[in-house]
C-alpha cells in the first residue's frame, strides 16, 4: 500500500465491482496472497475461496475465507463449479497465460464472470517515464528498507513478461470469454480485464 499510495485498494475494489455478480456468488481468488481481495469480495456479499500455491501466503491470509493450497493452472475444482474468478497482480508471473485462461474457463459456470487485475504500461510517454523511474529505481530502495529488496527489483522486470493488451483480450476471448474487455486504471499504471463465460 505504501508503494502505490493506497491506489491498490481502489484498484481491487474496482475489480470486485466489475465482476458484477449477485450476492452469495462463489468466487475463487487466485494467487490470493494475504487475502486482500477476499476481504473486498466479502464486503460485496460474495463468497470467496482463497487459492495460492504458497503455504506461507495462505498462512498469512487475513480474510478467514476457505482456502486451498493449489496450482492455479490445475485448480482442484470440478468443471463449471464457481460463479467467478478474480486474480490480482499474478498474470505477469505465469509462463503460459492461455493455459491459465483455459483453466479459468473450465471451472466457471456459463454466465459467470472473470476479473484480472495486473500492472500496466502507461501509454502516455511522460507517465510511462515517471512510472519507470518510480518502479525501477525508487520502489526497490523502499522495498530494501521494508522487506525483500529482490522481490521489489523483480517487479519492474516482470511487467515486460505481459503481452500487449490486444493479445491478452484475444486470448481471453478464445478461452471462452467472448465479451472480454480491457481497461486502463490510473493512467495505465494498472490494467483490468473482465469477461463473461460463454
Regions from the PLM with identified roles:
Residues 175-178, 184-198:
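Core SAM-dependent methyltransferase catalytic element
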Residues 5-23:
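Conserved alpha-helix/loop element of class I SAM-dependent methyltransferases that forms part
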Residues 73-85:
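A short acidic, Gly/Pro-enriched loop at the edge of an enzyme's catalytic core
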Residues 37, 120-171, 181:
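C-terminal alpha-helical "lid/dimerization" subdomain adjacent to the S-adenosyl-L-methionine
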Residues 98-113:
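A short glycine-rich, Lys/Arg-flanked "PGG" loop and its adjoining helix->strand segment in the class I
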Residues 84-97, 120:
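A short SAM/SAH-binding and catalytic strip from SAM-dependent methyltransferases
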Residues 48, 114-115, 179:
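A short hydrophobic/small-residue beta-strand
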Residues 26-75:
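Class I SAM-dependent methyltransferase SAM/SAH-binding core
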